[in-house]
Design a protein with these regions (language model features):
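Bacterial Sec-dependent N-terminal signal peptides
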Residues: 15-42, 173-174, 179-180
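Sec-dependent bacterial lipoprotein signal peptides
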Residues: 1-20
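Tryptophan-anchored aromatic micro-motifs
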Residues: 36-58, 116-124
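Extended, loop-rich substrate-binding clefts of extracytoplasmic carbohydrate-active enzymes
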Residues: 129-154, 158-160
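Surface-exposed helix/loop patches within compact recognition domains
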Residues: 58-139
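Sequence contexts marking disulfide-bonded cysteines in secreted/extracellular proteins
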Residues: 22, 80-82, 109-116, 167-170, ...
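Edge beta-strand at a domain terminus
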Residues: 28, 148-180
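Short, hydrophobic/aromatic-rich segments at coil-to-beta transitions
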Residues: 38-39, 66-70, 141-148
Length: 180
């Protein structure tokens, strides 16, 4: 009787160990975290651990077939097109560049083979490359681009909300609001 109980006990322990170590085909354990919906308030959150709320931004239209440069800051700049976006520990900035003109639609951030759509958060001394997020452009006019953005990297970098960027074109030797 003791042998039967010992074998039963060992069998149960063995099954428990095998069950605990086995893998599952449940997709929910492997799926990536889905991104939240866009906030309907002004783009805000944390950059480099500092509270951040969007104030001024621009997209620079290249004078030739170069790249479109995007800059967003929490600084209240007097002129989105001609001001300097420096980025500092108290006012980090967001920068990005794309080879295509802004157009209505949505894109996910990525950094993998064949895909390099990223944002850079800059705090005056360090560039943080952000590869998780999404950007949705709602409207593009001669003078502005409106949209929504969600971007995250760890607990110190997360923003979500809406933005309006000035479209800036070269006018002589300076940039000014586009007037096509």
């Amino acid at each position: 009787m003791k042998k039967i109980m010992a074998y039963t006990f060992l069998t149960i322990c063995g099954l428990l160990i095998i069950g605990a170590c086995s893998s599952t085909d449940d997709d929910s354990s492997r799926s990536s975290t889905s991104m939240p919906d866009y906030e309907t308030t002004t783009l805000s959150g944390k950059i480099a651990g500092v509270s951040w709320t969007f104030d001024t931004g621009r997209v620079v239209v290249p004078s030739s077939g170069s790249t479109y440069s995007y800059s967003l800051t929490s600084d209240n700049l007097s002129n989105a097109c001609s001001s300097t976006y420096t980025g500092s520990s108290s006012h980090p900035k967001i920068i990005a560049s794309r080879s295509e003109a802004p157009s209505v639609g949505e894109e996910e951030l990525c950094f993998s083979s064949g895909c390099s759509k990223t944002l850079t958060f800059y705090d005056g001394s360090m560039n943080y490359i952000i590869t998780t997020g999404k950007i949705k452009i709602d409207t593009v006019t001669t003078t502005e681009v409106t949209g929504k953005m969600y971007a995250k990297s760890g607990s110190d970098h997360e923003i979500n909300g809406t933005f309006t960027l000035s479209r800036c074109c070269l006018s002589g030797s300076n940039y000014a609001l586009c007037s096509e």
